């Protein structure tokens, strides 16, 4: 009778030659090992397949615009240039937005030989304030050029003071060094954006928040006053005093992020509120009967087409299943963003219409609910409805 404690030999296949070489019997792994290797292989295979498809999708859209990269430019010519505004996702860091731009948008722009300049923000309102200030500077400059100088009107009769000029205005290095005589004259650099007003440059907003701030900044710059109103100054002073008082009452509440924010200048408040758009005058200093251009003959940024990329960013414990699905299907995101970027490189635009105010609106569905509620309490710019004035948007264009 066989012993109950006797272990039955494990089933498997064996070869005498292999046994003499010290190789044990070949058999299937245990049930637990089978489950482990099945899970590892499935997950690893899914990740590897998705990354392979990402490369294929990226290559497809890079090849779709490579004909633009084959265009040769002269020594005095520079290609088209975009302005890119990038904002961090709600309740997340700016690095997430920059990572998305580098992986999904930048390769197609590089393949199409499109130059770009990035403007990013670390706080809400930075993009809006920067855009509005650029337009105000343009208006101030135009106002100074149109206003005759007092010295010229008086014929400089009453001006007995010696007028000082910088050395660079009097002469340049090549005027005093004979070596520069062997070189040709100054190269007159021409931008591709100055050739055709309808296809000049372009604006890309990465994130619904960046688009809201850009559009609000354009309205503030064109419809708002040139100087900060007294009501805005009083409100900023009041907010600064409240913040200082709160900091004194709760000194232990400050963290590293608060210390970094306190070292920065506060974001300027709006010079004009959205409800006052209709009663405001549209940039009287600028000649809006034609396309407004800079000193180089390039249409200014608010005259250029605009496009917005939604930020597919999920946070929160309840969104973990959706995050897992998106992680294994990034190839669809690469394909979508590649197609959108190729449209921008192809440089086809149309007039701005009402529905374009809702560009990337689907991104707001992913915003954390608690963050949105907190933003409404603080009167955040991102959670407010985007107001617009037809006098401003009628001059704008969007990529199609």
Swiss-Prot record:
GO terms for cellular component: cytoplasm; intracellular membrane-bounded organelle; membrane; mitochondrial inner membrane. Keywords: Membrane, Mitochondrion, Mitochondrion inner membrane, Protein transport, Translocation, Transmembrane, Transmembrane helix, Transport. Residues 50-400 are mitochondrial intermembrane. Residues 143-152, 240-250 have a biased composition (Basic and acidic residues). It is a single-pass membrane protein. Residues 143-166, 240-266 are annotated as: Disordered. The keyword Transmembrane helix applies. The chain crosses the membrane at residues 33-49. The keyword Protein transport applies. Residues 251-261 have a biased composition (Acidic residues). Coiled coil: none annotated. It is found in: Mitochondrion inner membrane. Residues 1-32 are mitochondrial matrix. Pfam families: Tim54. One of its GO terms (biological process) is protein transport. Disulfide bonds: none annotated. Essential component of the TIM22 complex, a complex that mediates the import and insertion of multi-pass transmembrane proteins into the mitochondrial inner membrane. The TIM22 complex forms a twin-pore translocase that uses the membrane potential as external driving force. Component of the TIM22 complex, whose core is composed of TIM22 and TIM54, associated with the 70 kDa heterohexamer composed of TIM9 and TIM10 (or TIM8 and TIM13). Belongs to the TIM54 family. This is Mitochondrial import inner membrane translocase subunit TIM54.
């Amino acid at each position: 009778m066989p012993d109950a404690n006797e272990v039955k030999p494990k089933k498997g296949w064996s070869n005498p030659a292999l046994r003499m070489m010290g190789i044990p019997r070949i058999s299937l792994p245990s049930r637990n090992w089978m489950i482990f290797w099945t899970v590892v292989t499935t997950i690893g295979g899914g990740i590897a397949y998705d990354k392979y498809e990402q490369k294929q999708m990226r290559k497809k859209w890079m090849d779709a615009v490579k004909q633009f990269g084959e265009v040769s430019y002269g020594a005095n010519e520079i290609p088209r240039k975009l302005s890119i505004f990038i904002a961090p996702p709600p309740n997340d860091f700016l690095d997430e937005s920059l990572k998305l731009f580098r992986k999904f948008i930048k390769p197609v722009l590089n393949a199409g030989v499109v130059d770009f300049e990035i403007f990013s923000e670390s706080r809400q309102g930075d993009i809006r304030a920067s855009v509005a200030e650029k337009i105000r500077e343009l208006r101030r400059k135009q106002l100074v050029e149109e206003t005759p100088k007092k010295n010229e009107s008086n014929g400089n009769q009453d001006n007995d003071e010696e007028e000082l000029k910088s050395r660079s205005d009097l002469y340049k290095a090549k005027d005093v060094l004979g070596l520069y005589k062997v070189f040709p004259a100054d190269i007159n650099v021409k931008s591709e954006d100055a050739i055709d007003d309808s296809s000049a440059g372009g604006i890309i907003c990465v994130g619904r928040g960046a688009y809201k701030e850009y559009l609000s900044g354009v309205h503030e710059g064109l419809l708002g006053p040139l100087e900060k109103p007294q009501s805005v100054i009083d409100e900023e002073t009041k907010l600064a005093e409240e913040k200082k008082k709160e900091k004194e009452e709760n000194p232990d509440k400050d963290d590293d992020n608060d210390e970094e924010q306190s070292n920065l200048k506060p974001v300027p408040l709006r010079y004009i509120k959205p409800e006052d758009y209709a009663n405001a005058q549209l940039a009287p200093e600028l000649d809006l009967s034609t396309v407004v251009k800079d000193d180089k003959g390039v249409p200014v940024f608010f005259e250029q087409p605009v496009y917005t990329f939604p930020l597919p960013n999920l946070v929160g414990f309840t969104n973990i299943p959706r995050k897992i699905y998106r992680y294994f299907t990034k190839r669809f995101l690469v394909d979508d963003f590649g197609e959108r970027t190729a449209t921008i490189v192809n440089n086809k635009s149309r007039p701005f219409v009402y529905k374009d105010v809702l560009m990337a609106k689907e991104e707001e569905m992913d915003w954390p609910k608690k963050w949105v509620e907190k933003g409404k309490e603080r009167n955040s710019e991102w959670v407010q409805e985007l107001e617009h004035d037809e006098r401003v948007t009628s001059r704008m264009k969007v990529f199609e």
